[in-house]
């Protein structure tokens, strides 16, 4: 049975990092798309420690008469997912939508997510149709999608697309999780009973630079695998067992060749042995790296430092009273 609670209020959460070039267009297009829904809404913009003029643009937008914009200013850069979690702490909506600030995913798709959620889904994901990224972005992303899907067991076709919709109870459940490393789409699907995906348009980035280069994608893959599953550790044990078995068989094979061809064969085979030895040493370092990732995350969790620090919350006078009233009801 699907969740059929009405959606009367929509919160749109957008993390912002050095996006002053695209912010004016983002604001106008997102507000226009939200107006077209015919529902109450708010636009929550989180400045994730930007070094440009992004925070000032957000402040000006929140200060406009009858503004729907809420600005959350973090004291430094904490990363995309932590910034979104900071936004989740201050939303009021029945449905919460996340969106990147680069305009590659059009804000005009927001009403489509709301319509799909109103069919009774707790979480609505998106799949980018005809991606406009370079091959260096597309192919690593496809590889990461396949690896993460196999490792986590979560059925999602496009982990990198942050244009998504979540019911309020899913967001509330995520806020009760306190791990330092969080990947929101996978975490949300763990609390959503009914999930769906829709196709969305994808555009080229017209202004600014992508915050995810090739190495960032590799780091993201490690974050995904080590923060959501212990499958890499199990795989490491399997690979280690396979290497050990191969080593034993290869040793027996060398003994057999030595018996057949004599002691001189062993001298001639020194360099192949060194090559194989380096392969084994490399495998050990990979394993140590994975173990280090997990130990490092345990260390971060034990320190229990906050995932982010909100320096300021910018709310216009028109919406301040409504937010105070809602907070009093929730308390």
UniProtKB/Swiss-Prot annotation:
Pathway assigned in UniProt: Glycolipid biosynthesis; 4-amino-4-deoxy-alpha-L-arabinose undecaprenyl phosphate biosynthesis; 4-amino-4-deoxy-alpha-L-arabinose undecaprenyl phosphate from UDP-4-deoxy-4-formamido-beta-L-arabinose and undecaprenyl phosphate: step 1/2; Bacterial outer membrane biogenesis; lipopolysaccharide biosynthesis
Compartment annotation: Cell inner membrane
InterPro entries listed in its UniProt record: ArnC_tfrase, Glyco_trans_2-like, Glycosyltransferase_2, Nucleotide-diphossugar_trans
TM ranges: 236-256, 270-290
Give the EC class as a word. transferase
User: In which broad location class does this protein mainly occur, judging by the first location in its UniProt entry?
Assistant: membrane
Pfam families cross-referenced by the UniProt entry: Glycos_transf_2 (PF00535)
Q: Which reaction does it catalyse?
A: UDP-4-deoxy-4-formamido-beta-L-arabinose + di-trans,octa-cis-undecaprenyl phosphate = 4-deoxy-4-formamido-alpha-L-arabinopyranosyl di-trans,octa-cis-undecaprenyl phosphate + UDP
User: Could you mention a single GO BP entry for this protein?
Assistant: lipopolysaccharide biosynthetic process
Assigned GO CC terms:
plasma membrane
Q: How does it sit in the membrane?
A: Multi-pass membrane protein
Under the heading Gene3D superfamilies, the entry gives: Spore Coat Polysaccharide Biosynthesis Protein SpsA, Chain A
Q: Which UniProt keywords apply?
A: Antibiotic resistance, Cell inner membrane, Cell membrane, Glycosyltransferase, Lipid A biosynthesis, Lipid biosynthesis, Lipid metabolism, Lipopolysaccharide biosynthesis, Membrane, Transferase, Transmembrane, Transmembrane helix
The entry's family comment says: Belongs to the glycosyltransferase 2 family.
PANTHER family, alphabetically? Answer: UNDECAPRENYL-PHOSPHATE 4-DEOXY-4-FORMAMIDO-L-ARABINOSE TRANSFERASE (PTHR48090:SF3), UNDECAPRENYL-PHOSPHATE 4-DEOXY-4-FORMAMIDO-L-ARABINOSE TRANSFERASE-RELATED (PTHR48090)
Q: What does this protein do?
A: Catalyzes the transfer of 4-deoxy-4-formamido-L-arabinose from UDP to undecaprenyl phosphate. The modified arabinose is attached to lipid A and is required for resistance to polymyxin and cationic antimicrobial peptides.
Name of the protein described by the UniProt record: Undecaprenyl-phosphate 4-deoxy-4-formamido-L-arabinose transferase
Organism for this UniProt entry: Shewanella sediminis (strain HAW-EB3)
